[in-house]
């Protein structure tokens, strides 16, 4: 959490399950606000018990600002069934904590089903669709619940598929995602977008996109690697969020052409 704050973050989205009490202790102490997320969007007895336990456990936390009811539930999120489930969950949350809003993180079906029930609508990666949605539903708060997802290897600047290396520049991402600069340019120019949560702050075990095969066993999405060492996007976010000036220029192996582009992050306009 200290590393994220140094980068310029002021909010943490738990995904896709409740965070540990120790993490929330750190957020309470360090001043990081949190969107607290239950494990699954469902209204069966077990799911409702999990939701209730989450709210009861964390409702007195000063860091918690909203309750997320689910993430990318494609089978139900745009349906009447999904809306009924979300209403049931929202009623339970409101009964236990009437002071905080509810949210869901969706990657499609904006304007249908669940999106009509929750107080805050989270957009996963569909940042370009937020302007049109706001024009249709101007009273609903919206934010980027997952944004970015540039893939990068710390300290490397030439792609090498044989070694499972992607360059650390803010250039490569899966088809559904965007660069840091692309999503932030949209959000920064539209005050009705309440910021965004990048995927992800740190690399993590699993989802080794773009290679998805051995020996890659960890993700490339983080602004920091799994040990907390900054990658290049860290300095971009730090420049735009903490106003600390420029970050260090990238350095790396020379490309086959004999030259390596140099990038730097800056808060100057």
Model-predicted segments: where are they?
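Extended substrate-binding grooves/exosites of carbohydrate-active enzymes
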Residues: 1-269
């Amino acid at each position: 959490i200290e590393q994220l704050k140094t980068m310029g973050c002021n909010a943490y989205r738990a995904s896709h399950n409740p965070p540990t009490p120790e993490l929330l202790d750190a957020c309470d102490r360090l001043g990081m606000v949190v969107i607290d997320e239950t494990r699954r969007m469902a209204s069966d007895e077990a799911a409702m018990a999990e939701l209730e336990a989450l709210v009861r456990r964390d409702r007195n936390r000063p860091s918690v600002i909203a309750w997320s009811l689910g993430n990318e539930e494609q089978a139900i999120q745009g349906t009447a069934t999904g809306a009924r489930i979300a209403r049931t969950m929202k009623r339970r949350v409101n009964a236990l904590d009437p002071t905080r809003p509810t949210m869901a993180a969706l990657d499609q079906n904006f304007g249908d089903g669940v999106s009509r029930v929750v107080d805050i609508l989270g957009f996963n990666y569909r940042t370009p669709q937020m302007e049109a949605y706001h024009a249709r539903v101007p009273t609903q708060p919206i934010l980027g619940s997952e944004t970015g997802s540039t893939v990068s290897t710390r300290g490397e600047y030439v792609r090498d598929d044989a070694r499972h290396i992607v360059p650390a520049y803010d250039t490569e991402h899966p088809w559904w995602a965007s660069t840091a600069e692309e999503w932030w340019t949209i959000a920064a120019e539209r005050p009705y977008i309440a910021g965004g949560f990048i995927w992800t702050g740190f690399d993590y075990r699993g989802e080794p996109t773009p290679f998805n095969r051995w020996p890659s066993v960890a993700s490339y999405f983080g602004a920091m690697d799994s040990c907390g060492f900054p990658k290049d996007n860290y300095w971009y976010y730090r420049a735009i969020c903490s106003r600390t000036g420029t970050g260090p220029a990238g350095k790396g192996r020379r490309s086959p052409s004999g030259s390596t582009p140099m990038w730097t992050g800056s808060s100057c306009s």
